[in-house]
Amino acid sequence: MAETANNGELQNVTLKDIFEQIKEVFSTYISSYVHILNKFIGILRKVSTMRFERSTLIKYVKKLRFFNETLLNYEFPLLTSSDITTVRLQVKAIGSFFIKFLEMQDILNYYLTQSVQNEVISKTLNYKLNFPDAAIERIEDSYNHFVKFTQWMMQSLLIDDELSQIEVIQFSIKCAVEDNVDLTQTTNIFLQEVAPVESLAEYMELSEEWVAILKDLIARMENEFSLAVVQWTEATEKKK
């Protein structure tokens, strides 16, 4: 709670700052997708047979922009106390929004890295118009960590009801149980248990560490996206 600060109000401002950092990193993550999808849509405009896929991706871009605008317009309240109950209410509210976004993102990632990839090969016979394997790996790794962070930010504060579950984590646990996987020895990030924090000071410290990790993952993903754009551009220029 307030043991790391003599003034409770200062502690509350710090909590608000932490929430703003989390909000910013999610916004950056969403913006990265909007940017690369717009680039990819521009490339697909040159391929008449990919009209349906292009239209679907445009719909996803609109959804992503909606999520981002909603997030950016949201103002975190200035907490009047560092009471854990008050913080839980705030975390549950923003966590629920993140879960809604991530469930859609899961479908988008599948569509982008599986369905569209197959259609590109089938309709153009040009594999260089696809996302490179390195970019797909970054997409998956970044998504997995954003999912795990969202689970952590809620469950570390003992927010763990039926409406706060994330499908990909629940499915991973179900499969692990059926396969008799030792959950204490697994390297699967979705199967790793979330330990509750002992104080809000610890929660804030770990949140900042998480934000740093997520920022690094976004930077790595954006680097692969830039390389993908170069590949697509070169592939389409050769056809002129």
Curated annotation (Swiss-Prot):
What stretches pass through the bilayer? none
Q: Which UniProt keywords apply?
A: Cytoplasm, mRNA transport, Nucleus, RNA-binding, Transport
- Record's GO cellular component terms: cytoplasm; nucleus
Q: Which Gene3D superfamilies match?
A: She2 domain (1.20.200.20)
Instruction: State a single Gene Ontology molecular function.
Output: RNA binding
Tell me where on the tree of life, at the top rank, the source sits.
Eukaryota
Query: Where does it live in the cell?
Result: Cytoplasm; Nucleus
Known function: RNA-binding protein that binds specific mRNAs including the ASH1 mRNA, coding for a repressor of the HO endonuclease. Part of the mRNA localization machinery that restricts accumulation of certain proteins to the bud and in the daughter cell.
Q: Which family does it belong to?
A: Belongs to the SHE2 family.
Subunit (UniProt): Homodimer and homotetramer.
Q: In its UniProt entry, what is this protein called? A: SWI5-dependent HO expression protein 2
